Every structure is written in C-alpha cells, then in structure tokens.
Curated annotation (Swiss-Prot):
Biased composition (Basic and acidic residues): 814-854
PROSITE patterns: PCI (PS50250)
Domain PCI: 316-511
Protein name stated in the entry: Eukaryotic translation initiation factor 3 subunit A
Function: RNA-binding component of the eukaryotic translation initiation factor 3 (eIF-3) complex, which is involved in protein synthesis of a specialized repertoire of mRNAs and, together with other initiation factors, stimulates binding of mRNA and methionyl-tRNAi to the 40S ribosome. The eIF-3 complex specifically targets and initiates translation of a subset of mRNAs involved in cell proliferation.
InterPro entries documented for this protein: EIF3A, eIF3a_PCI_TPR-like, PCI_dom
Family: Belongs to the eIF-3 subunit A family.
Coiled-coil regions listed in the entry: 92-123, 555-755, 790-860
Gene of this entry: TIF3A1
Protein's organism: Zea mays (Maize)
A Pfam family annotated for this UniProt entry: eIF3a_PCI_TPR-like
Region (Disordered): 814-962
Amino acid sequence: MATFAKPENALKRAEELIHVGQKQSALQALHDLITSKRYRSWQKPLEKIMMKYVELCVDLRKGRFAKDGLIQYRIVCQQVNVSSLEDVIKHFMQLSNEKAEQAKSQVEALEDALDVEDLEADKRPEDLMLSFVSGEKGKDRSDKEVVTPWFKFLWETYRTVLEILRNNSKLEALYAMTAHRAFQFCKQYKRTTEFRSCVRSIRNHLANLNKYRDQRDRPDLTAPESLQLYLDTRVEQLKVATELSLWQEAFRSVEDIHGLMTMVKKMPKPSILVVYYAKLTEIFWISDSHLYHAYAWLKLFNLQKSYNKNLSQKDLQLIASSVLLAALSVSPYDKKYGAFETENEKERNMRLSNLVNFSLDNKRENREMPSRPYLLSELASKGVLSCASQEVRDLYNLLEHRFLPLDLASKVQPLLLKISKIGGKLSSASSVPEVKLSQYISALEKLTTLRVLQQASCIFKSIKIDMLSRMIPFFDFSVVEKISVDAAKQNFVAIKVDHLSGVVQFGTVDIESDGLSDHLSVLADSLNKARIHICPPVKKPSKLGESLISLAAIVENEHKRLLARKSIIEKRKEELERQILEKEKEEEKKRMSSQKKTVDEERVRLLNEQRQREQDRIRREIEEKNKAEAKKMLEDLNKAGKKHVVVEGELTKEAYMELARNEQLKERHEMEKKLQKFAKTMDYLERAKRQEEAPLIEQAFQKRLEEEKILHEQEQLREIELSKQHHASDLQEKNRLSRMLEHKNALQERIIQERAAEFGRLKKERDERMNRLISSRKHERETVRKLMFYLNLEEQRIEMLREEEEARKREAEERRKREEAERKAKLDAIAEKQRLREIELEEKAKATREKLLKGSEAVRAPDSAPVAQPPRESAAAAAAAAAAAPAPSKYIPKFKRGGDSSSIPSGSRDEDRWGSRGPLRQDGPPARLDAPSSRQDTDRWRGSRFPSNSTSSSSTWSRSRN
C-alpha cells in the first residue's frame, strides 16, 4: 500500500491512473488513503477525495468499496463537519440515479431503433437462433444486460446510505430524504421485494433506537422535528405500500405510525391523520373488517369537517354518504367463537380499536365495545345523517327503521342503482383522492336480504321459495340460501329450507332473543291492562297496608336471591371454563409430549436410515470405483500389450494391479534390450558417418578460406578509395578556410590579452581580499588569546582564595577539636577525683554512723527515766561528722574538710542555696553552646545509682567553676 505525505498527492495519483485507464488501481489507492489511520481528522482535501472516490465506485459499480469509504468518512466528519458528509452522500446518490436513468434511456433508445416495419428482415440468422434457444425477448435480454445491474447498484446505494445515516440526530433530514427516494424507486419500478426489505431495515433501525438509549448522537423522538420526520417517512411508506397492494406491509406501517403517535401527547398534524385514516379505510375494506372500516371513515369525516375549512359541500356530502354506507355495510349480527377464538378475537378487537383511536377500558366489567348499534348512534349524534345525500338517508331509513317485509327489496333496489352512480374524484382540498360508493352495493344487497328474512320471519311461519325469490331480486335463491344458513348459524334468524316441498319455514328463535322478549313483554302488558279493565281489583286498605309493609322486605330478599343466583352462575361458569381450560391444557400437553416423542423417534429413525443409506452408498461407490479402475487397467494392458490378456475368475482391482505390475516388468526388460541393441547400431552409424564426412569437411574449409580472402581484398580496396576521397575533401576545406587564418589569429590574440588582463585584475582583488581576511583573523586570534589569558589568571586567583579559605577552616576545626579534647580530659580527671572523694566520704560517714549506733545502745536508759544528754564527745563526733559531710552538689576542698565549720551550719547553707536538702547528686559538667557533643562524652562516667538532673548539675558546675 502506497503512503502519501499529503492527501492531495493521492488525488493526483488517482487522476493520473484514471487518464491511463486504470480506474481500479485509482480506486484502490483512494481506498487505502481513506481507510488509513493517518488521516483521522477532517481536512478540506478529503472532501474532494471522497467525491472522486464515489465517482469511481459508481463507474465500477463497487458498492462494498463505497460503503467502507463512507463509514470511514462518517467517523472523520461526525464531530467536525457533518455537512461535508451530506454533500458526499447526495453526490453519491445523484451519480447512481443518473447512471440508472442513462441505462434506462439507452434501452428505450435501442427499442425505438428496433421498432421498424419488417423485423424479420433486420435480424440475422444467428440472432434468430439465439432468440429461439434462449426463449427470451429482446427487451428482457436488454434489461438483464444493461438496466438490471444499474438498478441493483442503485438499490444497494439506497441501502448503504440508510445504514450509514441510521440513528444519527445530525443526519435525520438526509435519512428521511433517502428513505423517501428508496420508496419512490420501489413504487416506480414495482419492486415489492426490495420494498419489504427496506421497510424491515427502517423498522429495525427504530427498534434499535428505542433499545439502546445511551447511544451517542441518537435522535430524540420527543422532539417535534425528529418525530415529524419519522412520521413523514412512515406515511410515505404507507402510501407506497397501498399503491403496491402490499396490504400486510401497509397494516404494519399503520401500526408503526400509531406507535409513533402514542409516544408523545401532542396530536399530530391533521394532514397526517387524514392520510392515516384514509389508508385505514382501504386496509380494513380489503381485510373485510367492515366495522372498523366504518369507524375509520367516521374519524376521517370528523377530521375533514373540523379542520378542512376549504372543503366544499359536495365533497362533504360524498364523505358523509361513504360513512353512512360503510356503517350500513356492517353485518347486523356478531359472529360467535369458541373459548380460544374468543380470546384471539378480543385481542384483535383491542388492536384494531386502538388503531382507529377507539379507547377500550380493560378494567371495566361492562365496557362499551365497538359495535354496529353504537356506531349508528354515533353517526346520528355527530350529524352525519344530515350531511349525507337524500338517497343514502332514504336507504338508511328503509333498512333500519321501516318494517316492510314484502316491499323492502323493491324499494331498496332503485336507491342502490342511484347510489352506484354517485362518486368520483374529490377536490384537492379534501385530501381524499376519490370516493366510490359502488363498492358498498354488494354488502348493502346482503343486508337487505337479511332484513327481508328477519321481517318475514316475524309475520310468516312458512313461505314458498318462488315468492321469497321474487321478494329478493338481487340474488339467486342459492345465494339467498347461503346467506340464510350463515344467519341461522349465528342465531340471527331461525329458518329451514325444504326443497321437497319448495317452501321456507321460519321457526322460533331462542327464548333469550331480543325480538321475542320484546313481543312477550308487549303481550304481557296488553293482557294485564285488559284484565284490569275487565276485572278491576277490590280495594282492601287493611290487606294493602299489610302487603306494603312486607313488600320492601320481599323485594329486598328477591333482589338478594337473584344477585346470589347470578354470582353462583358466574362462579359455576368460571369454574367450568377453568376446568375445560385445564383439561384442554392437559390434553394439549399430552398431545405435545406424544407428538414430540413421535417426532423424536421419527427423527432418530430417519437419521439411522439416512446414515445406513449413506454407508451403503459409500460402499457401493467404492466397489464401483474399484471395478471401474480394474476395467480401465485391463483396457490399458490390452492396448499396450501385443497379445490380449485373459483373466479367469472374478474381476478385482488387486489381481489386475499384480498383473499390470508383472507386465510392466516384462516390458521394461524388453525395452532395455532394445535400447542396448539400438545404442550399438547408433555407434556403428556414427563412426561410419564421421569417416565419410571428414574429407568433405576439409574441402569445404578450403573453399571457405578462398572466399574470405577474396572478400578481404575487396574490402581493403574499398577502404583505400574512401580514404582518398576523404583526404581530397579535407584539402578543399583547408584551402577554403585558409583565408580566414589571419583574422582568427588576431581574434585569438585579442581574446587571450583580455582574458589575461581580467585574470590579473581578479587575482589582485583576490590577494587584497585574502590579506584583509588574514589580518582580521590575526586580530581576532589576538583578542581571543588575551581574553583567555585574563580568564586563566582570574580562575587561578579564585582557586587560590578558595584554597586559603579551606585551609583557614581546616585549622580552625583542628584547633577546636584540640581544645575540646583538652577540656574533656580535664573534666574526666576532675570527675575521677570527685568519684574517689565521694567513696572516701561514704566510708567515713558509714564508720561514723556505726559509732553513733553503738554509743546510743550503751547509754540507752529505762522507759521511765528521763532522757540523758549525750556525752560531749558523742555530740562533738556527730557535729564533726555532720560538718565533714559535704553539701549536696558542692565541692569542698580538702584543707576545709577537717576544719571548724560550726560557724556556718551546713543545713542552713544548703537550704539557702538549693531550697531543700536532698541526696548527693553528681552530674557531668554542662555543655557549651559551641560544643554540643561534650555532654554525650561526659555521660560515660556517670554511675547508674546516681540519678541524672541536667539542670541542677549544670548550674552547680557553673557555680563551682565560677
């Protein structure tokens, strides 16, 4: 893959390749550039490259390359310049459309060119044979060869663009435009399969949008602009689906539109709702859902009447007539279903009711379901009857409010004939293209037939078939019979056809039917009134009062009994339904398990049979292959050998392989013998040939020498002649140019002098320039040398100062260390003396205490005797001992220890000095500020039995030193 420093270089390279006809190489070069990781930031040249890239993709019909390139370009432009991506995609779709249109116009031009009077005369025999063999027409073949590839590429373009633009809030408008173009393509060329695929893709895009809500740049469907774009796309999808008669896709599109409309509380635009309900009328009519078809027409009528102010009275009358006829076309009875079918029908009604915006409350017990009576009451309340045409109103009155069993059909038939002629296209203001009332004629004829049968059953017990056929002129009696059977099945009318007697018998319907209940209630009221008039009741106030007292309780009890009975019946029904449902579930489960077991067994049996068949087939194929190879080897042996090989026994591959091996060995030996004999013969022939050709070669060599000698002499003569001619021509040229020799010499001399002068001048200038340069260089070197000398002197001076300073510091440090050592030695000596002195004093004090104790024991008197005064010697000894004892932390010289110290008592002296008397403390001397390590040195001689007190000892030492 070639790498380019700039994107413009890749574009130039691609254009060069295009000019020489290598479009594939140009496309590959641009593809490598676009997919490269070096260009991940958007640049203006990338847009030109993408334009050229999509042009090449369209020319070569490379849809996969186009998709890869557009995906990479979307990543580059997503956060920087989305408009550039839009321009590229629009250019891509425009080129694809143009190519498809060109192919189509080319085929049309070809068809016009072939549209001549005598087609047979223009066709060649080869064309006729080809058309006969292929069985295709010229147009179909042209379409497959020219148009179809471009249409496939155009469709692939639409799919690629939709895939690239999906679920992107910045590209919603372009996404909607592409979807509309794809729908129009399917509509124009009747592409139903492609339309289904496109709708499926768009639906999946919306599902993924709702599923992955944390996606970046996802469209917000709650925004009005986004929702409107999606609604417009689905409405266009609905239109195209109905025009292509894809009713299932149309119904799914309606559900998509309804789902989008329910996502927001705001009501969509009336124009969208008009299209929505107009298409719903078509879908429901096709699916024979006449009730919801009428509801859709009612919604459409309300929208047109409320929002369309430009609607003419004629258009409104046509729409109202359609609504009323659609309501009349609904079957007058509801179909009955089983238990499971009822649930399915209920779910279906829920879905369809939601589509026509008919709200159903699932929690209500007696909720209002969409029905024909409710719909007719809605039409009356909404004023639809007043807006409909007179013929439609008359038809409504005849079918719903008149009781004319004999003349009903005859009165309805002319009205239906008039109604069938009403209709046509509406104005552009109505948003409904066309109204056809004739589509309701068949349903209205069926309704008229049912009304005739219903009313006839009320007045006739039986009627002849001929008379009934005259009463219903719309259908043959077979059709009437079919309609009556369906009505009887749904308990709408009780009827029985007796073909033997040629009569139709009407029976009584169920006791629960509405019609019979009405007749019985009316009859009961009439009989009750007659009884009252004939036999008026006797007034008995006393009994009436007693009856009135107990009447409330009776009514209450009866009401409770009826409610209890109703609840019991409901519970029994529910229990019965539950039991039936459980039984059906159990049966279904058993059936499914047995079916599953049967299916598994059948699958295992089929697999075994298939495996056995496969093994048999492989074995047969191997045997057949071995036999075929054996036959082939036999044939090869028979072809190669001189005699026919006959094999006895069964034909096997191994036997023929052994036979072939033996035959090959025999042939090899024979061939070796033949080759040896042939080599000996060739030696004889070669030796004889060389003996015969030796004199002939010598003769030919001599002849060739003579020929070459003659040729050499001829070449020498020709060369001499040419040299003479050249010499003569050179002499003539010299004579011609000799007259200009003087001028040439003068010019040469002048030029030499000028060049010498110029050379001297330039040399002088060069010498001067060199001298100046040398002097300047000398000056610079002198300056640098002086500067370096000064810098060296300065460095030497600084170095000397630094060495002197270090020497001073070193001497001061050594002096300090000596002084410290001397001081430490003195302190050690003093401490040693002090320690010895303390030991001596302790021994003396101990001896003194022992003497005092002995003296006190000797002079101790009885308890009652007065205490005698101590002898004078003892007191003197004690005083001497007390005087001899030194004060705490005070140094006493030796010459003062034995002297008289009675003048200054030691106790008062110690109290005055220290404030208290305590044990003897001896600490080291205090450390000086300039010697921090002296205290650590003096701690080594301190004993463990003397506590340390730095403050007191330091102050004592300082005082003693002072």
